[in-house]
Amino acid sequence: RCRTRAKTPRNLALADSLVDKATEIIKYFKSKNPDLIWFIENGDSTMLWGREVAKDLSNYVRLDYCQYNGPGYRKRTRIAHSDNIIWNPRPLCDPKTCKQCVDGKHILTAQQGPGKRNGTRTASSLDTCTLDTLHGLPRELTEEILRICQQHIWEVL
């Protein structure tokens, strides 16, 4: 995929090595605790999910941050998880009914600079997100993940 505004080239070797290390850590701790619960999050439309390094990340859910009262943008993401949990996330966003949309458009775009509206770049400083905002999980999503983990613990006991 072409990144027309990218300032640096993709480093797929580095990205793959990070995923390899994460799966290595998961396998190590799973050998110590076969009931281990784990999660790996990455954007839904990223190249990761089609790469060889992600072939074992086959249990996943797709969700939109806006459905968890996130900061105002959609950000569709994919969260791979261990096969010992059942997770039915909230439905994907429908801009016609989404509480974070005005006239069918999300109030923010998931990027650091101003976004586009109707094909033209906006100059609004209100449509600018900090890196911390973009990297954070919505509180309600974090709470849902915690409930899944707590429920699993009680099932095991």
Q: What function would you assign to each model-found segment?
A:
Residues 1-157:
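Conserved active-site and SAM-binding loop architecture
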